[in-house]
C-alpha cells in the first residue's frame, strides 16, 4: 500500500524532474505567467547568454501592474511604466512569447486573465514573478510567486529548484451566514493564524464553507494565502471547478476533456494523509471583516471595537498594534464606523472578477456615493469589463457616482496614477494594507466588495448586514 498523500504532495511528486541526493529537487513548470515589472532583467539574462525561451507555448504575458486605468496610452503612468511596457512588447516579440498587451481583448491582471482563459488547469505547476500567484491554487494547481532570477531560470529551462514545503490544512466548517463572502472568510482565517502563521507551509483550504464558494470566491481565498505567510494555497478541484473551466479558450476539448476530468478527479488529499498543521474555523461565527492595522492579520469584525495594544500578550504584537494605530490614525475602543473614508477601491487580483462587480453593483444600485468620497471600480480584465457592461453594471456604478475604469492592478499598489494622498483613508478590496502600499502615508482597510461599496455610499464603514 503506497503512502497516503496530501493534494500538495501529489502535485509536487508528479512534477519532480531530478531529485539528486543532497540537492534541492528540480520541478517541471507547466505554466509561466509574465508581466511588465518582474520580467525585463530575466529576458536580458537570456539575451546575454544566447538562450531561447524553452517553451513559448507554456508562457503567457500581459500588462497589468502599471497600466493606466483611464486611458490606453502607455505614456500615461510615467517614464518607468512606459519603459517597462515597451520592453515587455519588445521581449515578447523577440522571443516569440504570447503577449496580451494594453490593446488586446484578453489584457488584464495576470491572475484574472490566466483562469478566465483556461490557461490555469488543475494539477499544474504555475509560476509568475508576482507574490499573489497563489490565486491559481483555487483550481487545485500548485501556484506560487518567484523572483526575477527564477523567472529567467523558468524561461530558459521550464524548471525550477523547489524544496518540499510543510503542509497545513485550514478547514472552515459548516455554512456562513447571509452576507458573508469569501473575502470575510479569508480575512477571518488570517486574523486567526496571524500574518506569519502559515510561513513555510503550503495550505489546503477545505470544509463546507470553502466547497460552497464559486471559483471567483475560491480565487479570493487562495489569493490571500500568501498573506498568512504561506508559500501557496490549494483547493481540491470538483464539479464547480470543471464547470468553470469547460469551454474556455485553452481548456482541453472532446476526448481530451474527458481524460483531463478523469485525472483531475484524483487530485484530492487521501483520507488518511497527515498534515503538519491543522487550523479549524466555524463558518457560522464569521462576521463581515475589516482590517484596522498595517498587516492583514490585524483584522476585526465590523461590529467589534478597535483593539487596544494592551489586549496583546506578546510584546512584539503589542508594539506592532501601537505603531499600527498611530499610522492609521485610529483610537482603541472606538468603532471603525466612527471614521470617514476618503477613497474606495473595488478591484485587484483579489476581488475584480465578475462576481465581485455584481456584488458591488447590487449595493450601489439606486444609491449615491457620499460627496466627500472618490470611488473607483476597476475590473480585473477586458473580459470582465465586457461582461459587466453587457450586464449593465457600468451604468449602475456611473449613475451612483462611482468611476468605471479600464482594467489593471490600479490602486492595489499605486504603480500608476491611482493612489492615496498622505493620511487618506481607503476601503479597499485588495490584499495588502501595508504602510504606503496604496500611496505614501495612505491608510488602507481591507474589505469585501459589498462592504467597500457600502462604505462609499455611507461615507464610512458600515455593517453590510444592516445596510
UniProtKB/Swiss-Prot annotation:
Cofactor note: Binds 1 [4Fe-4S] cluster per subunit.
Keywords: 4Fe-4S, Amino-acid biosynthesis, Branched-chain amino acid biosynthesis, Iron, Iron-sulfur, Leucine biosynthesis, Lyase, Metal-binding
A matching Pfam family: Aconitase
Reactions performed catalytically: (2R,3S)-3-isopropylmalate = (2S)-2-isopropylmalate
Enzyme class: lyase
Physiological role: Catalyzes the isomerization between 2-isopropylmalate and 3-isopropylmalate, via the formation of 2-isopropylmaleate.
Protein name according to UniProt: 3-isopropylmalate dehydratase large subunit
Species per Swiss-Prot/TrEMBL record: Vibrio cholerae serotype O1 (strain ATCC 39315 / El Tor Inaba N16961)
Organismal lineage: Bacteria, Pseudomonadati, Pseudomonadota, Gammaproteobacteria, Vibrionales
Amino acid at each position: 500500500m503506497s503512502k497516503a498523500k496530501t493534494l500538495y504532495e501529489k502535485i509536487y511528486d508528479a512534477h519532480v524532474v531530478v531529485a539528486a541526493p543532497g540537492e534541492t529537487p528540480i520541478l517541471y513548470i507547466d505554466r509561466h505567467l509574465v508581466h511588465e515589472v518582474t520580467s525585463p532583467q530575466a529576458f536580458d539574462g537570456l539575451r546575454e547568454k544566447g538562450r531561447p525561451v524553452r517553451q513559448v507555448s507554456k508562457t503567457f504575458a500581459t500588462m497589468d501592474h502599471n497600466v493606466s486605468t483611464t486611458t490606453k496610452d502607455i505614456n500615461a503612468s510615467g517614464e518607468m511604466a512606459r519603459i517597462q511596457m515597451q520592453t515587455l512588447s519588445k521581449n515578447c516579440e523577440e522571443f516569440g512569447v504570447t503577449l496580451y498587451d494594453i490593446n488586446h481583448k484578453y489584457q488584464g491582471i495576470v491572475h484574472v486573465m490566466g483562469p478566465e482563459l483556461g490557461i490555469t488547469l488543475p494539477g499544474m505547476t504555475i509560476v509568475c514573478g508576482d507574490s499573489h500567484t497563489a490565486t491559481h491554487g483555487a483550481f487545485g494547481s500548485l501556484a506560487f510567486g518567484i523572483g526575477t532570477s527564477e523567472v529567467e531560470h523558468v524561461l530558459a529551462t521550464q524548471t525550477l529548484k523547489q524544496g518540499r514545503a510543510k503542509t497545513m490544512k485550514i478547514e472552515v466548517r459548516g455554512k456562513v451566514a447571509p452576507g458573508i463572502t469569501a473575502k470575510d472568510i479569508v480575512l477571518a482565517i488570517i486574523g486567526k493564524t496571524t500574518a506569519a502563521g502559515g510561513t513555510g507551509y503550503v495550505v489546503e483550504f477545505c470544509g463546507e464553507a470553502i466547497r460552497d464558494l464559486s471559483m471567483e470566491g475560491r480565487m479570493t481565498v487562495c489569493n490571500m494565502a500568501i498573506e498568512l505567510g504561506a508559500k501557496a494555497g490549494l483547493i481540491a478541484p470538483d464539479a464547480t471547478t470543471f464547470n468553470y473551466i469547460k469551454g474556455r479558450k485553452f481548456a482541453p476539448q472532446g476526448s481530451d476533456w474527458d481524460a483531463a476530468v478523469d485525472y483531475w478527479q484524483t487530485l484530492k488529499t487521501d483520507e488518511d494523509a497527515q498534515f503538519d498543521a491543522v487550523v479549524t474555523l466555524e463558518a457560522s461565527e464569521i462576521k463581515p471583516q475589516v482590517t484596522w492595522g498595517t498587516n492583514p492579520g490585524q483584522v476585526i469584525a465590523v461590529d467589534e471595537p478597535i483593539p487596544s495594544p494592551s489586549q496583546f500578550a506578546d510584546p512584539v504584537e503589542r508594539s506592532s498594534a501601537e505603531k499600527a494605530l498611530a499610522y492609521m490614525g485610529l483610537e482603541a475602543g472606538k468603532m471603525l464606523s466612527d471614521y470617514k473614508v476618503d477613497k474606495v477601491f473595488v478591484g485587484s487580483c483579489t476581488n475584480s472578477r465578475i462576481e465581485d462587480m455584481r456584488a458591488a453593483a447590487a449595493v450601489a444600485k439606486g444609491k449615491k456615493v457620499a460627496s466627500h468620497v472618490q470611488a473607483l471600480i476597476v475590473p480585473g480584465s477586458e473580459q470582465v469589463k465586457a461582461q459587466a457592461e453587457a450586464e449593465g453594471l457600468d451604468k449602475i456604478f456611473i449613475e451612483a457616482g462611482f468611476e468605471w475604469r479600464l482594467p489593471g492592478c490600479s490602486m492595489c499598489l499605486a504603480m500608476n496614477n491611482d493612489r492615496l494622498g498622505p493620511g487618506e483613508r481607503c476601503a479597499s478590496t485588495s490584499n495588502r494594507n501595508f504602510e504606503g502600499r496604496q500611496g505614501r502615508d495612505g491608510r488602507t482597510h481591507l474589505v469585501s466588495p459589498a462592504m467597500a461599496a457600502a462604505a462609499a455610499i455611507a461615507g464610512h464603514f458600515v455593517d453590510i448586514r444592516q445596510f
